[in-house]
Amino acid sequence: MPESPRLDHLYVNGYVESRPRTARGMGKTAIRPVDRETHGKRLIEEIDAVFEKEQEARDSQVLDPELRADGTYLTLEGGEVAFGLKLDSLTRMTRHQKTPKRPQWLLLTVHPATENFPERATIWVSDEFRYKFIKLFKDYLTVDTKHNRPKNNALVANISHVQATFLDDLWTSKGMPPYDGWWDLWLENSRVDNELLQRVLAAFELEESQQRTRINDSLIVRVHATQKKIKHLIATPLPLTEIRAPSFIDSFDDLSFSEQSEYVLDLDARVSSAQAGAPVVCHLD
């Protein structure tokens, strides 16, 4: 029997394991049976309560008006595991043809359901388009489709609760957020205003590292602060998408496999292949 070939040049990171499917929002979604009127009215009341509390928090801040939030973070909680949140309805942009599109509301992070907690999705709703977001739920109550079902049924029926967003909802690293230390703020790069960013960091006396990283559509800003100060950033116009624990690494190999993949995909998007017959230089280090 021939000897098995040596494949030392291949590295297998981890092994195959069975996991429940967590990606949802694409295609058909099982719809949770609920009482239409009771459920719809309760969700509208919860959304209104979050918006009202957010406005009270802004009014109590001693900040320049320019440093106050121009949108509200909401956390949508699912019900049973079988009825996933309709994630593809949680991002909507304006439909301008000649001017850049602006977000009406954006899906930021998703926490899959576990044995102890239901699925949670954190979104950001622009102040300018609050009324359109609430209209999704009002239409659910009053408008029927041609199939005699509530409009936006798959979206609204599968949301069990709507609540204010806290640090834990934006935190995507393992474990609990620290009380003090370094934090990686992931910002939506297209909406970052560098001057505004510097003013917010100065207003809350946050120490910024010299290291800034761009990956795909995200700008990662590393800051040193207490947990209390980080919580205040939710009430500012910074376009936060998630908050992570920083990775202090000496080399690319120190990154996790998923983090390496992010950097490789980002590099691939920025590299153009040379044409056939182009000069080739071999650099030996």
Task: Give residue ranges: language-model regions.
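Acidic-leg catalytic submotif of subtilisin-like serine proteases
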Residues: 266-285
